[in-house]
């Protein structure tokens, strides 16, 4: 159950908790999940996602209220739907009722038909570049102030830019390492001479690798 804080100090409470998480959490993705948990407890957030930009694509990096399959479906092109539009323009967007807006794609398929909730999406900017988005589905009642919520999310997006950038860099470094390892493995398998030459020590290492490698029947 959301522990909604109705006081005028809502923003300060949220930002204090998020700032504490940034100081104490070193894992980028875990930090993003922690931030979404804060928004859930404090803002009547039903679902929330951080997307990360890779080239012309946006992929969900962290979420609250989505399962693994729903996260995998949350794949957008820059410029596509509300999330893609925010990533393309660098400007926030608010939909007061997603059931009445045809631009809302519901790509994750988490929203029920006719479900009346608001959707707020803000860009995450690092070094003047949009590197991702933060979006939430929010229940709406007579006390809801969507403009206030948007401004708060923009502040959150600004202060987590470094964390999302670090997560993006880690993804890129892992991908580069995997590609390099695959290239090295292919060379060792198909043309070891290019790497080993006539060095007797390297020849011994290569013989050891071949000896310990599993056979195709294993």
Please state what every model-predicted region is.
Residues 32, 185-218:
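AAA+ ATPase active-site-proximal loops
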Residues 117-125:
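A short, aliphatic-rich beta-strand micro-motif
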Residues 2-7, 138-154:
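Regulatory loop-to-helix N-cap segments in sensory/regulatory domains
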Residues 59, 68-70, 96-118:
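Signal-transducing coupling segments at domain and membrane junctions
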Residues 69-93:
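Acidic/proline- and glycine-rich, intrinsically disordered low-complexity segments
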Residues 1-30, 41, 61-62, 176-186:
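Signal-transmission linkers at sensory-effector interfaces
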Residues 164-195:
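Conserved ASCE P-loop NTPase core motifs with emphasis on AAA+ ATPases
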Residues 14, 126, 144-163:
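Amphipathic alpha-helical "output/dimerization" segments
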């Amino acid at each position: 159950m959301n522990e909604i804080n109705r006081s005028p100090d809502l923003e300060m409470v949220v930002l204090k908790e998020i700032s504490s998480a940034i100081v104490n959490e070193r894992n980028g993705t875990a930090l993003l999940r922690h931030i979404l948990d804060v928004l859930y407890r404090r803002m009547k957030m039903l679902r929330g996602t951080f997307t990360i930009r890779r080239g012309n694509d946006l992929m969900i990096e962290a979420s609250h209220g989505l399962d693994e399959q729903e996260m995998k479906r949350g794949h957008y092109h820059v410029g596509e739907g509300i999330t893609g539009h925010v990533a393309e323009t660098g400007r926030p967007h608010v939909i007061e009722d997603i059931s009445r807006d045809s631009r809302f794609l519901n790509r994750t398929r988490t929203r029920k038909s006719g479900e009346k909730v608001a959707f707020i999406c803000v860009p995450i900017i690092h070094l003047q570049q949009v590197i991702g988005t933060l979006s939430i589905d929010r229940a709406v009642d007579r006390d809801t102030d969507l403009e206030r919520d948007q401004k708060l999310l923009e502040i959150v997006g600004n202060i987590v830019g470094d964390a999302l950038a670090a997560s993006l860099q880690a993804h890129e470094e892992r991908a580069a390492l995997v590609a390099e390892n695959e290239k090295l493995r292919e060379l060792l398998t198909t043309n070891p001479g290019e790497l080993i030459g006539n060095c007797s020590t390297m020849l011994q290492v290569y013989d050891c690798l071949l000896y310990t490698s599993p056979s195709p029947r294993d």
